[in-house]
């Protein structure tokens, strides 16, 4: 944030965000603080996110099975190349629950994606995040942007949308893909894949049985 000349603006912005009590939209900020947003739009969003209390999307703790292993994994340092694919053909094993758990327990580190175009995903990537989760709806694995996954692990993302930019992630991130179908094993180098197959009969939520 600017150190000189903008202190009053930022103090007013802080008071406004706290009074609002929820994450402001870009439109909200533009209408209330147009000059501040024009100069520091990304800082406005990051500052508001840091000020507000994190939202608890779910309760419980992943204690057994693939969830416990994944929770332990994202709590530590990320592998420099590996991309994790959690494959659950049956469904309802707690993949979306785990995304909510990460957002609740690691709100400043986690970003969740669905299916999207390559340029849209690249534009949305927050370089401060260290846990990237892709929650893929059933039947849409063929639209997964493998090049984005690889760029995340390489920490280098070219974003051509709007104001083109070259993003460099702060650190090597964890990357997880949750899907009901098998990934394309020819889309990436062999050493990129770690495929975790959820046994049939596992039911979602915390405390899964292995």
Segments from the language model and where they lie:
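P-loop NTPase catalytic core of nucleic-acid-dependent motor ATPases
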Residues: 1-128, 133, 137, 196, ...
């Amino acid at each position: 944030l600017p150190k000189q000349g903008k202190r009053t603006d930022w103090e007013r912005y802080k008071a406004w965000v706290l009074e609002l009590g929820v994450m402001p939209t870009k439109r909200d900020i533009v209408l209330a603080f147009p000059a501040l947003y024009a100069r520091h739009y990304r800082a406005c969003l990051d500052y508001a996110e840091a000020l507000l209390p994190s939202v608890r999307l779910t309760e419980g703790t992943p204690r057994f099975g693939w969830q416990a292993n994944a929770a332990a994994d994202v709590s530590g340092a990320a592998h420099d190349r590996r991309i994790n694919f959690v494959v659950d053909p049956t469904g309802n094993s707690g993949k979306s629950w785990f995304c909510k758990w990460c957002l609740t327990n690691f709100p400043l580190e986690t970003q969740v994606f669905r299916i999207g175009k390559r340029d849209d995903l690249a534009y949305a990537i927050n370089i401060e995040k260290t846990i990237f989760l892709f929650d893929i709806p059933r039947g849409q694995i063929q639209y997964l942007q493998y090049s984005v996954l690889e760029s995340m692990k390489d920490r280098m993302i070219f974003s051509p949308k709007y104001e083109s930019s070259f993003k460099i992630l702060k650190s090597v991130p964890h990357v997880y893909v949750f899907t009901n179908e098998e990934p394309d094993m020819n889309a990436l180098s062999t050493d990129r894949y770690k495929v975790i197959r959820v046994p049939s009969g596992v039911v979602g939520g915390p405390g899964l049985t292995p």
